[in-house]
Amino acid sequence: MSGLKRLISGITACSLLFSVTGTGVLQYDTSYAAEAKYNYAEALQKSLYFYEAQQAGPLPEWNRVSWRGDSTMSDDVTGGWYDAGDHVKFNLPMAYSASMLAWGLYQYSDGIKSAGQYDIYRNNLEFVLDYLVECDRGSEVVYQIGDGEQDHKWWGPVELVELEMGKRPSYTCDASCVTAEMSAALAAGAAALKDSDKASEYKKCAEHYFDIAWKTKSDDSYSKAKGFYDSWSGFWDELFWASNWLYIATGDKDYLKKAKECIPNLGKEDQSDELKYSWGMCWDDVMQGAMLLYAINTGDKEYKEHVAKHLDYWSKTEGVNGKCVQRAPGGLAWLDSWGSLRYATTAGFLAAVASDTIFSGDKAKVKQYKEFYETQINYALGDNPDKRSYVVGFGNNPPEHPHHRTSHGAWDDMKNDGVKDHRHVLY
């Protein structure tokens, strides 16, 4: 696989849930610029920078965001990432993002190293995994810190949140969706960082969280995130996802047996008994990524065919049985109006991994999937009808007003200062 392909895949892994963002004068490898339409190393660098803008608690020395400071220091668990442009710490989407960052490093470490981003990538991954470990409460986990309703009533930088609201509440549960997602993130991290001193700790905690999730097999206690990050897909997809990553991290075949037990309970196509293949992978529904891992882990023909069906639905104009994902002008694979680039770039990442693993010997599929993932990431970087970048701070005419309280920098809940333009660039 070419270095350029590895690098594009690494970018895709970083841009799944949050905006692709950052700021400052930073160093990145420019050697790919000559062979690529865009500077993918810069895009990767700015993708990673966003996670540093999201850091909660005491900031590490390596944090490069000059306009950020320590924040929410009285949280019951400090650290982790704030959600999107807000200040709540929701562990379901946070752990999903961590698991995908880990997969990117696990699968494409050479490309990340070639871009000059390996050390900072690793730092960002360990930062969030350390937080997930600290959320352990024995038979439960801390799954959320902050109240979404209260958070949305105030607009200002996160460094001032405690002055406005005081100590924030934390919430615990044993719900399978979030404990399994946290398990998957830690197991994927252990696999990606297998030479790290922290790998054994991540693996041990991943197994512990999985035991909670498997024993509970319910989302009843997952309540405070409703209305913000509901578990619409249920919990079987997260159990399937976590069991596959635990098999990779531990080599214990019992996790493959558990993965197989999950399959009959996974989502189906509407009015059908066929396993769902048309929906995209996201923070709520990790079935398609888990199915790809299962096909890699087992080599089972049936599940390789499922992966092909999913990717054909997304990447071929004729789709599957005459049906395919919608195409926006310019070639974007359009699934939903909320976070359309998120779905498209994630599908592109799965296409890249599949072409490098279970379909590496199929030249036609490798060509098809390569064209697909390049089209999707390049659309985000500027190959679209508006000829603009959708990455803040990157390329031509990027967005200038992202929904982000801290980068906006209003000082008094927009009562008097009336800041029109963002005080800080959220690359």
PLM features: what roles do these ranges have?
Residues 12-20:
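Hydrophobic core
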Residues 37-38, 84, 110-122, 196-200, ...:
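Short, surface-exposed loop/turn segments at secondary-structure junctions
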